[in-house]
Amino acid sequence: MSEAALVPPALSTNQTEETFNFQQYELLRQDRAAHLGPGITDLASLKERIRSYYAIESLADHLNSHAEYRSITLQFPDDLLFDSALVAEELQALLPDLQCARTDAPAQADTTCSCGTQKTCADSKDSADGRKIWILADTAYSPCCVDEVAAEHVQADVVVHFGDTCLNPVETLPVVYIFGEPYLDRAKVISLFTERYDKDAKVCLMANAPYSRHLESLSGELSQLGYSNLVFTDVALPDTPNAAATILGVSDSHPISHKLYASGDRVYYGAKEQLLCEEQLQSFELFHIGLPPDPRLLFLSTKFQGVTAYDTQKRQIAKGPFPAMMRRYRFMHVARTASTIGILVNTLSLKSTRSLISSLVELIRSCGKKHYMFVVGKPNVAKLANFEPVDVWCVLGCGHGGIVLDHANEFYKPIVTPYELTLALAPELSWTGAWVVDFNTVIDGISADLGLQAGAIPAENVPEFDAVTGKYVGNSRPLRELNHLEIESPQESITTGSTELVKKFSGALTIGSTVSTSAQFLQARQWTGLGSDFNAEDSYEEEGATVEEGLSGVARGYQYDVSNAEHTDADVPKTSGRVMNT
């Protein structure tokens, strides 16, 4: 047999090296007009706008002044992720020792280093000791928070956070915040503002962190048009900041304005020198530039008389739907009569997360309720639907964008905040309409509630009225009389079966004066498993299972479905007449 006969036939068409070349990523095709503005025609103008928007030079100077920052992580939100490669490239050009560390292969003694210098990589620092840049994509939790979990995977020394942020204090890593310099159509904003408000209206100008740089000049232009009752806000680190937090590219000086009030990460300024308080803000309308996340929007709706949001992407007033406070009040009533509470941890980087978890667990136990704890990155409907025994969820997340509000009614079980849970578990449910998202404030409130419950006389095991269903619930506090299970059974009472105790307690809902919510939930299910270890009379065959015919057909119409449909059609009386297709 010849060698030609041993060659297998070709199973595909002719392929060359060009066939396997990946499609090149075209930078100019991305629509960056929303944040970089119009006028980008070539790669040079794009890089110049990138350097200005992300304050690359200021960032490089800050990193060069901290030689201890060797592993640098850049965190981008999803809407700015396509700029990450250009930002890393421009930053590398200003960090000389970093390029030597990223050399793909060791250079020879007679060659030039890939960084462009005349020194060889053999004479420079080892690549393991040089600086490295990492890009953090697909953050574990809300993009406004610093992703310490992802940064620890690469042993980061510093996190550079770009875009909108909540400025919540983090536990360990130093943080550098760069909001950016987004483009704003000022003429469009002023036109929509004048159409909506009268000149004597009391309006507060607020924006997401990147757009806050436009508020002072925008307030000055509106004042020239006759609006005299205006205040605006600017971003600032909270009163209890992280000592290693730094904001670059933002000036905190306002020479022509007066500081009126400070609350959280916002400082209020105005042209008139007067003092404001939280009660006086209730008389102001809020004009917000940029569509804030739902938790932030709900929080602002409790602080001002009304909220109007300007969508910077569509360049129009956002029309909703917006989250409502009435749904929060209903969810609190559900949590009041819930027997099992799921603590959903939606952040691990906030400074008071662990303290809040401990306080919530202590509060839930003191109220006689069961709890489970879950750590889920970016919770969705499918993830939480796997835990049916949970009656209500308590989400621990950032108040800016880490709280799941479910205003579209997609989740199977209600989701409440720690503050709402503390109100629901109080002896008397009373709510002033305030919506607190600060962890430290909630912890102080839980400590006060535990102090009141310690001196109170425990109530008897009486049913509790459910305001949602209008019925009485008898097992809302299953651990109210928590006793350890002690079983004493004499040897002579034990039969030959080794599962006698299981038989005795398998159908019981109360064991040792303690309500078993798991047993109650299991008995309420239509399907309880593939079989029983102790019930010998329940479809048990010693010689083996009988082979039975299973389902047949496709998923859209199994055989028994087809039979039922035919049977139903046969029962429907037929009518005479002609059907016209329109």
Curated annotation (Swiss-Prot):
Cofactor note: Binds 1 [4Fe-4S] cluster per subunit. The cluster facilitates the reduction of the catalytic iron-sulfur cluster in the DPH1 subunit.
One Pfam family from the record: Diphthamide_syn
Record's subcellular location: Cytoplasm
Superkingdom as given in the UniProt entry: Eukaryota
GO biological process terms, semicolon-separated: protein histidyl modification to diphthamide
Gene3D superfamilies: Diphthamide synthesis DPH1/DPH2 domain 1, Diphthamide synthesis DPH1/DPH2 domain 3
GO annotation, cellular component aspect: 2-(3-amino-3-carboxypropyl)histidine synthase complex; cytoplasm
Required cofactor names: [4Fe-4S] cluster
Keywords assigned by UniProt, alphabetized: Cytoplasm, Iron, Iron-sulfur, Metal-binding
InterPro entries (alphabetical): DHP2, DPH1/DPH2, DPH1/DPH2_1, DPH1/DPH2_3
Positions contributing to [4Fe-4S] cluster binding: C145, C166, C398
Similarity field: Belongs to the DPH1/DPH2 family. DPH2 subfamily.
PANTHER family associated with the record: 2-(3-AMINO-3-CARBOXYPROPYL)HISTIDINE SYNTHASE SUBUNIT 2, DIPHTHAMIDE BIOSYNTHESIS PROTEIN
Complex and partners: Component of the 2-(3-amino-3-carboxypropyl)histidine synthase complex composed of DPH1, DPH2, DPH3 and a NADH-dependent reductase, predominantly CBR1.
Function comment: Required for the first step of diphthamide biosynthesis, a post-translational modification of histidine which occurs in elongation factor 2. DPH1 and DPH2 transfer a 3-amino-3-carboxypropyl (ACP) group from S-adenosyl-L-methionine (SAM) to a histidine residue, the reaction is assisted by a reduction system comprising DPH3 and a NADH-dependent reductase, predominantly CBR1. Facilitates the reduction of the catalytic iron-sulfur cluster found in the DPH1 subunit.
Protein name: 2-(3-amino-3-carboxypropyl)histidine synthase subunit 2
